[in-house]
Amino acid sequence: LMAMIENIYETMNLRITETAFELHLRKIYPTRNILSMRETETISGQACLDVQKKTDGSVNIIGEVATDPVASWMIQSAQVASKFTLFTHHAKTFPDLVTALRNSMLRAGVFKDERTAEEQVVSVLNFDIHLVKDFRGRRYIERITECIPVEERNEYTFDYRKEKTLEGKLDKFMDNATNFFTKTTNRELYKYRNVLEYHDGTYVLTNPISDNNIREMLNNMDDRDAEEFKKFVKRNYGIDAHRDSDDIEEEAK
C-alpha cells in the first residue's frame, strides 16, 4: 500500500484514516499533501472521516479494514468525497472479501438486509490486488481481480394482454412471477474475474479489463499516460479505448 503512493499523481491530495498509525506516509513522502488521522478515546473514527470529507481530498486511504466500524468508514469514503479509496484486508479469495465486508456492514448496523449490504459493497470494489508470502519468504502479487457489478434488467413483459384465454394469461403471469422470485431470492449481484495472475515467476494477463473501468481509468490519467494505456489495451486486448473527452472532441468536429 505504501509503495502504491508513488504511482498516484502528486496533484492528488491524500487523506488517511487509521485506528493506529502504521503507514507513516508523511515521513515517506514529505512533499505530498497528506492529512493523517486516527481515532482517540474522545474523538471517534467516524468524526475523523466526517472532517476529512470537508478537506478537498482526492484519495482516501483506510489503513486496515480489520473491524466492523472500519468497514463502514471504507464504504463511506469510497462512495463520497474522493476519486477512489485504497484499503487493506486479509480475505483469502474475492468472494470471501465481499462476504466479510457485507457481514461487517450488517454487524455495524449500517444495513439490515444482506442483499442491500452486498450491493453497496460490490458497488465500491473495483480491483482486488491479492498479495501472498510463500514459505521461502517471497512476497508477490498472486492475482489482480476485477469486480463487475451485475446491473438489474427489467425483464417483465405485458404479453398477458395479448392472450385471449384465461389459461394463456395465467401462463404469461407465471412467467413474470418466476422472474420476480428468481431476482428476489437468487439474483447474482456481481461477477469477478482475474485480469492478471502470477505463474511460474511471471505475470500473465488472463482476462481483459471491463470497458467501463478502462474508460474510468483513462478519464483520470494525464495525456501521456492515457496514450500509453490506450496502446497497452490495444496491444493486449484488441480494444480501441477512448476517454470521455475524446468523444466530446469527436462530436465537435
Predicted regions and their residues:
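Intrinsically disordered, low-complexity boundary segments flanking structured domains
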Residues: E22-K27, E114-E118, F127-V132, F173-T185, ...
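NTP-binding/hydrolysis catalytic cores, primarily Walker-type P-loop NTPases
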Residues: E142-K253
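Switch/coupling sub-region of P-loop NTPases
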Residues: I5-V122
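Amphipathic, soluble alpha/beta structural segments
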Residues: A66-Q79, F84-A100, G137, M217-A252
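A broadly conserved detector of short glycine/acidic/proline-rich loop/turn motifs that flank catalytic sites
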Residues: A20-F21, E41, A66, K133-F135, ...
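Post-Walker A alpha-helix
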Residues: L1-M2
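A generic structural signal for short, solvent-exposed coil/turn residues
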Residues: I8, Y29, R136, R187-E188
